[in-house]
Amino acid sequence: LAEVADGSNAFAKVLADAERPMIIVGSGALARDDGAAVLDLARKAAESTGMIAAEWNGFNVLQRAASRVGGLDLGFLPGEGGRDVAGIVAGAGKGEIDLLWLLGADEIDMATLGKAFVVYQGHHGDAGAHRADVILPGAAYTEKDATWVNTEGRVQHGRRAAYPPGDAREDW
């Protein structure tokens, strides 16, 4: 990646000559110990090969959770003394957090939540629903109007295709 970024690798020319080149960095690569360096080198490679321009964004980070990009755009980050997901899960496991509200979230290890009271709001019978003390049935994305930010950072709007079944409600 460093050689692509500095232009010494032949693939750098392939990228520079491409009509719409793109780098998509997975969030798993960023979770590594050297994740910040991977992100920096990928950004440098994108800049040096012309992937970032007014009419084209060829540098993207693929998130594992829906609308994470939108949340980041809005500044939804833990402030001073706040906790990220790992900190919340660890706090629940240690008994420092009594209530955990999962909005369609299942990418955490439910076995580590200790005795925290868990409310699950969502539309799948996933791991979060199986661990929950209370389940609030939610509408799927096809059952509600919604706005989200895609991987490229573009705002998109979806229209409801069907009504939610039973007691399911929109998340708000």
Residue ranges of model-derived segments:
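Non-catalytic alpha/beta scaffold blocks inside enzyme catalytic domains
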Residues: 1-172
